Amino acid sequence: MAPKRKASVQTEGSKKRRQGTEEEDSFRSTAEALRAAPADNRVIRVDPSCPFSRNPGIQVHEDYDCTLNQTNIGNNNNKFYIIQLLEEGSRFFCWNRWGRVGEVGQSKMNHFTCLEDAKKDFKKKFWEKTKNKWEERDRFVAQPNKYTLIEVQGEAESQEAVVKALSPQVYSGPVRTVVKPCSLDPATQNLITNIFSKEMFKNAMTLMNLDVKKMPLGKLTKQQIARGFEALEALEEAMKNPTGDGQSLEELSSCFYTVIPHNFGRSRPPPINSPDVLQAKKDMLLVLADIELAQTLQAAPGEEEEKVEEVPHPLDRDYQLLRCQLQLLDSGESEYKAIQTYLKQTGNSYRCPDLRHVWKVNREGEGDRFQAHSKLGNRRLLWHGTNVAVVAAILTSGLRIMPHSGGRVGKGIYFASENSKSAGYVTTMHCGGHQVGYMFLGEVALGKEHHITIDDPSLKSPPSGFDSVIARGQTEPDPAQDIELELDGQPVVVPQGPPVQCPSFKSSSFSQSEYLIYKESQCRLRYLLEIHL
């Protein structure tokens, strides 16, 4: 084997230490976090399909607003019902709209001159559809063959302020505020625009058959997503331990589609009746939770702008919300060239991704957490592909243990030494006539490797005495061409050669190697790549 060539690269770790390295399964820990989250503040809007929605004098009375949903796979039901009590001066209206999920549906407007009469009409309709009292909605209990209350949240007022801030000068009463010029370079400005794009989030939801009309961005609450996790947990338990007297998978699937509305058009909603379908819905909810996280970041209140003369540019504000330093690399730097070679040599041989930009990543607190493994050797720079909709969440929260209960190598964080393997997990967005995607390169402290050549989805940790699990593939980048980058004083192997056959693993069930760690702290994100596919 040729000696490894070294290139020295130094990065600064964060000075804030994050305590603890115990990792939990992401699915259950995410569900618990959502359940424990405080209720979101609601800003209630008039239903956009209501003819009064463009009348600024019409508003929803107090919190008399509800979105109901009902899915029954056996009867091919997948329907919604919206009720709002509207007011304008001394006039009151009870607005009802209903239909199949994904369609505008039918509507009805009742007029009242007495508020109490309007309230009675609202409460009566709520009772008819749910068999729950409006006054007891905080203790809502879903009833058979009735609608379920869906918790949604109006678009935050602060978001409107952010949009308005796009203009060079903003006046708020007698106080004049000026938006500062953006401090980010053009490539990073475009990155921040993309990973916080509402249109991108909506497209990601549409690809998952989620009803973006029922759950437009900014409206889905943490508590509602948590109910989706609970419904999937019930489905998983029913698959593992079927009983004759329990709910059927079809009934439990209907419960899931009721709390997380899906748009299937006029087609019958498909039952969640296999581990593969269940896993797809788990992954979907994790993406949904990450979308909610990105939206929560943007909706978080900043300083009161009316008290200052200058406000940050919206892109600077979003960048600061990530709590992550992104440094754009010049294409002439040694790091960039090494990454470019790594991509070209291990990318798809028919259509290799086109590298556009590379950012050095320094997540707040991650350097200190990674330091816990400073004595663990055998470090490699490895690929991780992802959905563009979760890039902001990853930059904020890092890579987390994914619930691969049906995964080939168990519950861990998956990496690859060949770009073409990880690129298969990249979901892109359309931007400027191109399909734009993002990939991460992480420094992974592998330590002592345990090799496998057949699937083992039961793995939750390496065997005793080992630090990682490698599903050895039939090919691997030519180790004779590996180089080393020095990152924070540690040598990190970076493949530079094309994939070659591995005679020792020619019978492996894995065509390409997969690298698994089971502690989130064993990885540090080092680079973010923008690619065109």
From Swiss-Prot:
It catalyses: L-aspartyl-[protein] + NAD(+) = 4-O-(ADP-D-ribosyl)-L-aspartyl-[protein] + nicotinamide; L-glutamyl-[protein] + NAD(+) = 5-O-(ADP-D-ribosyl)-L-glutamyl-[protein] + nicotinamide; L-lysyl-[protein] + NAD(+) = N(6)-(ADP-D-ribosyl)-L-lysyl-[protein] + nicotinamide + H(+). Residues 313-533 form the PARP catalytic domain. GO terms for biological process: DNA ADP-ribosylation; double-strand break repair; double-strand break repair via nonhomologous end joining; negative regulation of isotype switching; positive regulation of double-strand break repair via nonhomologous end joining; protein auto-ADP-ribosylation; protein localization to site of double-strand break; regulation of mitotic spindle organization. The modification N6-(ADP-ribosyl)lysine is found at K6. Residues 181-299 form the PARP alpha-helical domain. It is found in: Nucleus; Chromosome; Cytoplasm, Cytoskeleton, Microtubule organizing center, Centrosome; Cytoplasm, Cytoskeleton, Microtubule organizing center, Centrosome, Centriole. It comes from the Eukaryota. One of its GO terms (molecular function) is NAD+-protein-lysine ADP-ribosyltransferase activity. Residues 57-147 form the WGR domain. It is an enzyme of class 2 (transferase). Pfam families: PARP, PARP_reg, WGR. Its main location: nucleus. Its EC number is 2.4.2.-. InterPro entries: ARTD/PARP, Poly(ADP-ribose)pol_cat_dom, Poly(ADP-ribose)pol_reg_dom, Poly(ADP-ribose)pol_reg_dom_sf, WGR_dom_sf, WGR_domain. GO terms for cellular component: centriole; centrosome; cytoplasm; intercellular bridge; nuclear body; site of double-strand break. The keyword Lyase does not apply. PROSITE patterns: PARP_ALPHA_HD, PARP_CATALYTIC, WGR. Disruption phenotype: No visible phenotype in normal conditions, but mutant mice are sensitive to ionizing radiation. In B-cells, class switch recombination is increased, while somatic hypermutation is unaffected, due to increased occupancy of Aicda/Aid at the donor switch region. The modification ADP-ribosyl glutamic acid is found at E12, E24, E32, E160, E230, E309, E310. Keywords: ADP-ribosylation, Chromosome, Cytoplasm, Cytoskeleton, DNA damage, DNA repair, Glycosyltransferase, NAD, Nucleotidyltransferase, Nucleus, Transferase. The modification ADP-ribosyl aspartic acid is found at D138. Residues 1-30 are annotated as: Disordered. Interacts with PARP1; leading to activate PARP1 in absence of DNA. Interacts with PRKDC. Interacts with XRCC5/Ku80; the interaction is dependent on nucleic acids. Interacts with XRCC6/Ku70; the interaction is dependent on nucleic acids. Interacts with EZH2, HDAC1, HDAC2, SUZ12, YY1, LRIG3 and LIG4. Mono-ADP-ribosyltransferase that mediates mono-ADP-ribosylation of target proteins and plays a key role in the response to DNA damage. Mediates mono-ADP-ribosylation of glutamate, aspartate or lysine residues on target proteins. In contrast to PARP1 and PARP2, it is not able to mediate poly-ADP-ribosylation. Involved in DNA repair by mediating mono-ADP-ribosylation of a limited number of acceptor proteins involved in chromatin architecture and in DNA metabolism, such as histone H2B, XRCC5 and XRCC6. This is Protein mono-ADP-ribosyltransferase PARP3.
